[in-house]
């Protein structure tokens, strides 16, 4: 879940509230091809490169906890455990808003290298 943990998050978010998307109550403000920002889904089958790709770091508005680029910019590897299949979360520019929902996960084979999966260097907030 995307839970706001800042003591004074400002007017867009409420401390302690769980949000369905990393951008808040809606996917508005994320970087994805079709239904982010409330645009109707479209067919991209005629576009060979599937869109413009990931947005530059920090170019989307900050979301829950003031973090940038958490919504649909690139899938993030979230599982480094044993086994061939590894978990990803957060969606990417290649997919629509439904893939960035807090309950959505995908798996990819270990060693997958594609333009819509990345990683995030992170530190515990405590």
Model-predicted regions and their roles:
Residues 116-126:
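Short, structured beta-strand segments at or near domain termini in extracellular proteins/domains
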